[in-house]
Amino acid sequence: MALKLLKKLLFDRPLKNGVILNHQYKIEECLGMGGYGLVYLCTDILAQTPYVLKQLRPTKAKKEKEKVRFQQEIKLLKNIHHPQIPGFIDEFIIDGQAYYVMQFIEGENIEELLFFRKQPFTELMALQLISQLLEIIEYLHDRLIFHSDIRTPNIIINDGRLCLIDFGLAKQLTPEEMEEIKVRKQDDFFDLGETLLFLLYSQYKGKKKKNGTWLEELTLTKEVTLLLKRLLGIEEEYQHTASIREDLNRAIQSVT
C-alpha cells in the first residue's frame, strides 16, 4: 500500500502552473486528481478562453486497459451535445501521454454549497434543481448513456442553472445489454434520490437521532416522500424517467 502511494506521489505529480501543452493550452491550476485522471483549469492562449483539461495519470497510461477506458470517455463526450453538460473541445497525445479538453463550467458544486457555505434549499428549490437534473438524465438515458457517478461534487450550479460534470465512470450501452441497462439505470435513479435528500436536509434544524431515518427527521409532503421512496428503492422502483417526471411534477405542485 505504501509503495503504491509512493509511486503515485512520484509519477502522478500534477503539471506545473504555466506549462503550455500542444502549443495552445496553458495550465493555470490543478483542480483535482481522480481514480485515473488529473484535471486542470487551463487557458487556450490562442482564443483566450478558459477550458478544463484532463490528463490520464502517468501510472495508468502504461496500462492498455486504462488507455482504452480514457479513449472511451473521449468518444462518449464527443457524442454528447447538451447545454448543461460540458462540451468536448480537443484531444491530443504528447510523448505517449493522452489529454483531452472540454468546456469550463463556471459556478459552485452542490457539495460546496451544502457543506461549506451551508446554503439552505427550500423544498421547492430542491425539487426544481432535481427537475433540471432529471432533464439531463432523460437526455442521457434516451441515448443509453448512464453517468454512474451523480454526486453533489459533480453537479454545478450557476445562477440557478444546473450542469452535470465528470463522465469518467459513464458508459454508453447497446440495446442488447438489457441487464446492465437495468442496473445502471437504477444506479442513476438512486443517485438522483440521494441528491434530493441532501438538498432537503439543508433546511433541517432538528437534532439528528442516533438511529433516526430521513422519514422520521424530515417533514415532507406525501408526494415528495413517495418520490424519494421510489428513487431510493424503498418502494417500487421507477423503470423509466417518464414516471419520475410525473411524480416529480406532483411533488412540485404539493409544495407550491
Curated annotation (Swiss-Prot):
The keyword Transferase applies. InterPro entries: Kinase-like_dom_sf, Prot_kinase_dom, Protein_kinase_ATP_BS. The keyword ATP-binding applies. Pfam families: Pkinase. It catalyses: L-seryl-[protein] + ATP = O-phospho-L-seryl-[protein] + ADP + H(+); L-threonyl-[protein] + ATP = O-phospho-L-threonyl-[protein] + ADP + H(+). ATP binds at L31, G32, M33, G34, G35, Y36, G37, L38, V39, K54. GO terms for molecular function: ATP binding; protein serine kinase activity; protein serine/threonine kinase activity. SUPFAM superfamilies: Protein kinase-like (PK-like). This is Probable serine/threonine-protein kinase YbdM. It comes from Bacillus subtilis (strain 168). The lineage of its organism: Bacteria, Bacillati, Bacillota, Bacilli, Bacillales.
